[in-house]
Regions:
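The alpha/beta-hydrolase serine catalytic core
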Residues: 81-203
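Short hydrophobic segments within beta-strands
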Residues: 11-15, 65, 148-150
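Residue in the alpha/beta-hydrolase core beta-strand immediately N-terminal to the catalytic nucleophile
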Residues: 62-65, 81-83
Length: 203
C-alpha cells in the first residue's frame, strides 16, 4: 500500500469551469484517503502555466489530473505523474470555444467571480504556449503521463498526436468529452488507486 503519510492529488478543471467544479468535488468525495486540491486556473496561459507548476511544487503533488483544457496544462506538469482526460492540446484552434469577449463561468470561482474575459492577446498567448507543448519532455517524464480518450468525444480529437508522444500510455473509454460520474467511478478512480499504490509501494 501507499507508504506516504499524505498523498496529494491536484485536479485541473476545463475551460469555463473553476476549482469548484463537480468533478473535483466528486474526486474528493470518492477518494477521502487522499488530499484533493482543485485550484482555479488563471484565464491567461502566460499566467496559468507558471502558476500551476509552482502550485504543484509548493503542494508536493503526487498526481495531477486534468480534463480538457486542464489536461493540456496537466500534461505540461513534467515533474509529476499526470492523467490527461480528453486533452484540449490546441485551445487556439477551438474557435467555437475560445472566443474574444466576456463569458460566464459554469460555476463561480473560489473567490466569487462569475465572469471571465478572453482578449486577442490571450488567444495569442495560447498559440505561443502550444508551440512549446513538448519542450520539457524526456523519457522519464513521458512514462509518467497517461491519456484517457472518450470514444464519443466530439469536441477535441488529438488522440493520435498524444499517442505519438506518450505511447503506449493511452487508454480509451466509452464516453464523451465531458466527464460524468460513471466514467470517474468506473475508469478514472480505479486507475488512480492502482497508479498511486503501485508507485509508492516500494518507497
Amino acid at each position: 500500500m501507499i507508504c506516504k503519510k499524505t498523498t496529494t492529488i491536484v485536479y485541473l478543471h476545463g475551460y469555463g469551469s473553476t476549482g469548484l467544479s463537480c468533478t473535483g468535488e466528486y474526486l474528493a468525495k470518492k477518494l477521502p484517503q487522499y488530499r484533493i486540491l482543485t485550484p482555479d486556473i488563471p484565464v491567461d496561459p502566460a499566467e496559468a502555466l507558471p502558476f500551476l507548476r509552482q502550485y504543484c511544487e509548493d503542494n508536493k503533488a503526487d498526481l495531477v489530473i486534468g480534463t480538457s483544457m486542464g489536461a493540456m496544462y496537466a500534461m505540461q506538469m513534467y515533474d509529476f505523474h499526470r492523467i490527461c482526460v480528453n486533452p484540449a492540446l490546441y485551445m487556439s484552434q477551438l474557435t467555437e470555444v475560445l472566443k474574444v469577449g466576456t463569458h460566464q463561468y459554469f460555476i463561480s470561482t473560489q473567490t466569487g467571480e462569475t465572469q471571465f474575459t478572453i482578449t486577442p492577446e490571450i488567444i495569442e498567448h495560447y498559440r505561443e504556449m502550444e508551440s512549446h507543448l513538448y519542450d520539457g519532455l524526456n523519457d522519464e517524464n513521458r512514462r509518467r503521463c497517461w491519456g484517457f480518450f472518450g470514444d464519443e468525444d466530439n469536441i477535441v480529437d488529438w488522440r493520435q498526436e498524444f499517442l505519438k508522444q506518450f505511447y503506449p500510455n493511452v487508454i480509451d473509454f466509452h464516453g464523451g468529452h465531458r466527464l460524468n460520474n460513471a466514467v470517474l467511478r468506473d475508469v478514472i478512480i480505479p486507475f488512480v488507486k492502482m497508479l498511486l499504490e503501485a508507485e509508492y509501494t516500494d518507497e
